[in-house]
Each structure stands twice: as C-alpha cells, then as structure tokens.
Swiss-Prot record:
Residues 17-487 are extracellular. This is Envelope glycoprotein. GO terms for cellular component: membrane; viral envelope; virion membrane. It comes from Quaranfil virus (isolate QrfV/Tick/Afghanistan/EG_T_377/1968). Attaches the virus to host cellular receptor and later induces fusion of virion with host membrane. Residues 1-16 form the signal peptide. One of its GO terms (biological process) is symbiont-mediated perturbation of host process. Its main location: virion. It holds the Pfam family Baculo_gp64. The chain crosses the membrane at residues 488-505. InterPro entries: Baculovirus_Gp64. The lineage of its organism: Viruses, Riboviria, Orthornavirae, Negarnaviricota, Polyploviricotina. It is found in: Virion membrane. Residues 506-511 are cytoplasmic.
C-alpha cells in the first residue's frame, strides 16, 4: 500500500512541471573560457642614451674665377687670339672662418674689360692670389667676354664668391653594436643637398669644385646617460618604445628598435640593455606631447620623416594588440567567474542553463560537474500575468495550475529597471612629429642652389645668345660690333692689305 501511494506521488510531481526526464541528452560539462594567444607585452625597460648636438653651425662658401688673356696682331699674326678659362678656388676651412668673422668673402685680381690690364699689366691674368679684394657677395663682371687691343696683350679677370652661415641637423649613423651592452660605435653626420650623408669626422668637406662646407663643432659632441622607457614587445616584431621627458622636446615620440636592439632618433642614439621587463612592471602610456607641432606643408618628406611616421604606426599596432590582450584578460576573468556562478546556481535552478543557452529544458545533474539536459514544453509568453497554458509561476517555479484561482495580472504601466549603465569610451589622438624635410630644403642648401642657378642662367644666356644663329644672337653680335672700334679698324686694315697685294701683283706683271 505504501509503495502504491509513493508511486502516485512521484507521478503527480512529474506532471507538476512542464519538463520531462524521459528524453534527456548529455552528459555535458560547463567549460572555462579559453584566452586567445597574442604575444604582446608592455614594460618599462632600461635604455642607454647617447645624445649629440641637435644642430651644428656650418659655413658654406664658394669662389671661382673667369680669365680671358688675349692678343691682337692682325690676321697675318699667328699669335692673334684669346685664351679663356674658368678656375675654381674653393675656400679652405680657415678662410671660411675668416669670411664669417669679417662678414665678407675674399677674392683676387679684378681686371675689367677696357680697363688698365693691357700691355705689361696683362700679366695680372696670371696672378693667382685670392686675398686682394673683398665683398659681401661678388658675381662675375663680364663672364665669357673677350677684349682685344691691336699689338697689345689684354686681360679680363673677374671673380664670384659668397658664403652663408646656417644650422644643419645632426643624426647618428653607422651604428654598430659590440659584445657588451655599452660597446657601440657610431658616426655623427648630417645630409648634403642631395640627401647623401656628410660625416662630421672632418671639420670641413668639399661639396663641389667651387664650394666648401666648414662645421663649427663644439668641444664635447656626445654625452651618455641612462633612463627607463615604455616599450612594447612581441608579435614577432622588434621593440617599439615611447620616449619620455629625458629626451626633452622629443618627449612622447616613438622609436622602433632594430635586431641589435639599437635605434636612432634625431640627435639621440638608444640601446636597450636587457631586452626584457624590469621586474615585470607595466609601463604607463602617454599620448600627448606639447612639443609636437603641425607638419610643415609645401616641403617634401625625407626618409627620416617617413620612418618616424612608421614608428608611430608600429606603436599604435603594438598598443592595440596589448590593449586587446588586456581586454581579453579581463573578459576571461569575468567569464570564468560567471561560469563558476552558473555552475553553482544551476544546481538550485534546474532551468537556468536552458534559458542561458536559449532552449526550453532543465538540467539533471549527475555529479558536481556533469549533467543532462531534459526537454521542456513551450508554454508561450506569460506577458504581465503569472499564468499561461494551465501553468502558474509561483515561488520562482512553474507549476500546474489546478483551478486558476491564483492567477492575476498587472493592468498598470511597468517601469523598466536597467542593471548596466551605458559606458563612454575615449581613444587617444596620435600626433605626427614635426617634419624635418628633405635636405635640399634646408636653409644652407637652398641658398647654394639659388647661387648656382644664378651662375647657370648667366652662362646659359652668354652661350645661347652670343654663340647661336638665331635672330637674337645676330642682333647681339651686331650691337657689340657697332660699338667695337677695333672691329672697324680690322675691316679697313684687311681691305688695305688686300689692295697692297693686288698692286704688287700688277707691278710684277708689268715687269
């Protein structure tokens, strides 16, 4: 009798819920969240720093000479003619220093066309002294000109010279790392107008046949120190780091290290000492830099500028990877914690796991980890009532409703309650560093280019106008000939010579 009563009770309890235990699936286990693998770490790292001068003062100077040594003896004299030449006299380093102090350039003998340099004074064309005259700037006076005087030697000697004092940015080059952390060799250098490296090993360098550049080097060129900088490691990339206040106006800039863990930025050379974190401490990231200015427009970007931009991109890439790892870490911890809570609460609320995975079912636990999922019938929506499809929601459970006497509903408005507030996100704005520009845009090289262009334009006019066959060249020659007394004398003397020859032939025939 007792067994029959117990069987009836169990049958009633089984029909009290809309779920059945006859077609369960499983077993299942709630697994922990698996973190994705991203090899990025952010640490404070020891670095040795070599600092050179930010700029070095350079004196750029040029000097050359045009000479025309002529003799006119008539058409029958084999010595008649002109010898013309251009000779380059690039100033020495000592001369450039004197030019800068005196504020003027020095040059040699100046003999103008139609002046006093004829006869015995024509030998002044062979005077190669370079310190007889001075001027703030000197250009040729009669470039490619000739001057002839009958039965005399003549000389045209004219010079061009000038100088400019400018500042040239300094950088480290030829960096080679030795066996020790501090064993590094390097060279200080700047760039010429073509972007080629100019080493500062020598106080002066010859730019071309006419031009010399002399540097005013300070006594102490390089200082050495150490600091700690914030770096990203990983992703099969060499470290990318952000410079701190130790680097003065470069604070906040980014630099990418090479395979030897060395890097250069402007007048700084950096070498990582240990390649790893300092006690695993996480670095603090900065995004603002008061020293950054807007990029100068209208100038070409140098390779150095492009490299700096790439370093910013590398930092942004590594930073994104690192931040993603940190986000994954937090999310993973939350998900694992939530998994533990669900695993525990699911043993009390057998419908919890079914609702979380979006199915109508209840959990039937086999032990502390394994369980089966048993299907439940769909009852539809309860809406604002506590009853649906013959079942009632009571004391947190869905049960069979026998008579519906306890069913009720809310007729008024329902106030929503939000458990989570909206979160506003902030993202850093990366600034581009000030562009250095290509070397040919620097003040000193642009000045030299302008001076060379003036010389080219002068010589091009002389060659194209005086040496061509166009209308302009003919007018040019006729204009010069109309004011050339010797040309008129030469024409008449030639005519007289031919007349004397004809008379001599006639007299011989008569005899």
């Amino acid at each position: 009798m007792f067994m029959v009563a117990l069987s009836l009770l169990l049958l009633r309890l089984s029909t009290a819920s809309p779920c059945t235990s006859e077609a369960c699936s499983g077993p299942y286990r709630i697994s922990k969240y698996k973190m994705p693998t991203i090899d990025v770490s952010n640490h404070k790292t020891h670095v040795t720093v070599w600092k050179g001068p930010k700029e070095v003062t350079g004196i750029l100077g040029y000097r050359s000479r045009y000479t025309a040594y002529c003799y006119e003896g008539g058409v029958l004299d084999g010595n008649t003619g002109c010898t013309k030449w251009h000779v380059m006299f690039p100033p020495s380093a000592a001369e450039l220093q004197k030019w800068a102090i005196d504020g003027k350039c020095y040059y040699g003998v100046e003999c103008n066309k139609g002046g006093d340099c004829w006869g015995s004074w024509a030998d002044r064309c062979h005077d190669d002294r370079v310190d007889l005259n001075s001027a703030q700037e000197k250009e040729y006076n009669g470039n490619n000109d000739e001057w002839r005087m009958f039965a005399h030697h003549t000389c045209i000697s004219t010079w061009r010279c000038g100088f400019s004092k400018s500042s040239y940015p300094i950088h480290f080059t030829n960096v080679k790392k030795g066996r020790g952390d501090g064993d590094i060799t390097y060279t200080l250098a700047t760039y010429d107008q073509h972007g080629s490296i100019l080493s500062l090993d020598k106080p002066s360098v010859k730019i071309d046949q006419e031009t010399t550049l002399s540097f005013e080097l300070p006594r102490s060129l390089v200082s050495r120190s150490s600091t700690e900088i914030d770096c990203f490691f990983g992703n099969d990339q060499t470290p990318v780091c952000q410079l701190n206040e130790h680097f003065e106006d470069l604070e906040g800039q980014f630099v990418t290290f090479n395979g030897d863990y060395t890097a250069t930025y402007g007048n700084y050379l950096l070498a990582l000492n240990d390649k790893k974190a300092i006690n695993g401490s996480v670095g603090a990231k900065k995004f603002g830099n008061k020293a950054w200015v807007e990029k100068q427009l209208g100038k070409a970007a140098s390779l150095e500028d492009v490299r700096n931009i790439l370093s910013i991109q590398m930092w942004s890439h590594q930073e994104s990877g690192y931040n993603l790892v940190q986000l994954y870490k937090v999310v993973g911890e939350m998900m694992n914690t939530l998994t533990t809570v669900i695993n525990s609460v699911g043993k009390l609320d057998d419908e919890l796991i079914g609702r979380l995975i979006g199915v109508e079912g209840k959990s039937k636990w086999f032990n502390s980890e394994l369980f089966h999922m048993c299907p439940c019938f769909q009852l539809g929506s309860f809406g604002d009532s506590n009853c649906a499809s013959g079942y009632i929601f009571s004391e947190g459970r869905v049960k069979v409703d026998k008579d519906g006497s306890k069913c009720t509903s809310f007729g008024g408005s329902i106030t929503p309650l939000y458990l989570f507030d909206n979160v506003s996100y902030k993202f850093a704005v990366l600034h581009t560093p000030p562009a250095q520009g290509v070397a040919q845009d620097w003040e000193g090289w642009s000045w030299l280019a302008a001076e060379k262009q003036r010389l080219i334009e002068t010589m091009t006019f002389q060659d194209s106008v005086s040496g061509g066959n166009n209308v302009l060249s003919q007018l040019y020659k006729e204009t010069l000939d109309s004011f050339n007394i010797w040309k008129w004398f030469e024409r008449f003397s030639t005519l007289a010579a031919w007349g004397a020859l004809a008379i001599s032939v006639i007299n011989m025939m008569r005899k």
